[in-house]
Regions:
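Active-site phosphate-binding strand-loop segment of PLP-dependent enzymes
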Residues: 16, 22-75, 79
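Short Gly/Ser/Thr- and Asp/Glu-enriched loop/turn motifs at secondary-structure junctions
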Residues: 181-187
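Short, structured coil segments at secondary-structure junctions
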Residues: 11-12, 91-92, 176
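Substrate-binding/gating loop at the entrance of the active-site cleft, primarily
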Residues: 1-13
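PLP-dependent aminotransferase class I/II
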Residues: 94-174, 178-181
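Conserved PLP-binding active-site segment of the aspartate aminotransferase-like
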Residues: 117, 189-193
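Short glycine/serine/threonine/alanine-rich loop segments
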Residues: 13, 69, 178
Length: 193
């Protein structure tokens, strides 16, 4: 997500983008504190722009090797077939899972996102949210978000259609000589042979 860089620069927070491997995948060991000291970690799962999912065991290994910093898993595309990291919240107090209604709930313009974490971490976020949140929500946005969350049938139907279309597109792209990793998002990151 391009705003991570923008916010880090705005608040003068030093950051580093760790490159993906030759298959456009995250290498968990590159995120281990003993190999790469850091003040916190943020990564998308599934990855953007590749759509590749990082397994829960790989996410857990990152958490195990970074017990003293916050690890944020951005799950903007998780509803399109990836596994959420939420089950790891019971075991790791330093995990924060963030999601959005922009993708699978079709509310991109509303700018509704949310964080899932332990009570202490959410309390810290609530303490600063009005100081740093450039996307405050008005009554219309709140009503749209609540309606989207309640409309489970539309959500399931939309996600199913996107996933079916993605799988069909993969088959058609293969016929045309394209190759790609297994996308678990609503897009395909393809290269031509």
């Amino acid at each position: 997500y391009s705003f991570y860089d923008v916010w880090a620069e705005e608040f003068r927070i030093p950051y580093e983008q760790i490159p993906l491997d030759e298959n456009f995948c995250i290498v968990p060991e590159q995120y281990f504190a003993e190999n790469h000291p850091n003040g916190g970690i943020v990564f998308p799962n599934p990855n953007a722009p590749t759509g590749v999912e990082l397994s829960l065991s790989a996410i857990e290994s990152i958490l195990q090797h970074n017990p003293d910093v916050v690890v944020i898993v951005d799950e903007a595309y998780v509803d399109f077939g990836a596994a959420t990291a939420q089950p790891l919240l019971e075991k790791y107090e330093n995990l924060l899972v963030v999601q959005t209604t922009s993708k699978s709930r079709s509310l991109a313009g509303m700018r509704i996102g949310y964080a899932i974490g332990n009570e202490k971490m959410i309390s810290y976020l609530n303490d600063v949210k009005y100081s740093f949140n450039s996307y405050t929500m008005n009554q219309t946005t709140i009503a749209a978000g609540a309606a989207a969350i309640r409309d489970v049938e539309y959500f399931r139907k939309t996600v199913k259609k996107v996933m079916e279309t993605r799988e069909w597109s993969k088959e058609e792209l293969k016929k045309l000589g394209f190759s790609f990793e297994d996308s678990k998002s609503n897009f395909i990151f393809a290269t031509h042979k």
